[in-house]
């Protein structure tokens, strides 16, 4: 039997969005997703796809690694 690894991803999306004075709706529109998707990412209920994570990072002028942090359990 193998060992099961779980991973929780924390992120800085809310902090970056708020420091840029953007609403969830504005960021969602820029990313081509729903406001609910942005809310779910910010609260950790949804881990974005790699293309969306890259798009968010580029939008804020930073790297995926600076925004998303994996906690391995």
Regions found by a protein language model. Give the residues of each.
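Short alpha-helical DNA-recognition segment
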Residues: 21-40
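Short, charged recognition helix plus adjacent turn
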Residues: 1-3, 58, 68-73
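Key DNA-contact positions within bacterial/archaeal DNA-binding proteins
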Residues: 36, 46, 65
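A short, Lys/Arg-rich alpha-helix, primarily the initiator
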Residues: 1-19
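DNA major-groove recognition helix of helix-turn-helix/homeodomain DNA-binding modules
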Residues: 51-66
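Residue-level signal for the short linker/turn that defines the boundary of a DNA-recognition helix
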Residues: 11, 21-22, 48-51
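Alpha-helical residues within the helix-turn-helix
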Residues: 18, 29, 58
């Amino acid at each position: 039997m193998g060992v099961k690894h779980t991973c929780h991803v924390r992120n800085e999306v809310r902090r970056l969005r708020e420091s840029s004075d953007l609403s969830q709706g504005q960021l969602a529109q820029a990313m081509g997703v729903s406001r609910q998707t942005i809310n779910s990412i910010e609260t950790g209920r949804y881990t974005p796809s790699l293309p969306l994570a890259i798009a968010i990072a580029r939008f804020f002028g930073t790297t995926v690694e600076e925004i998303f942090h994996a906690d391995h359990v």
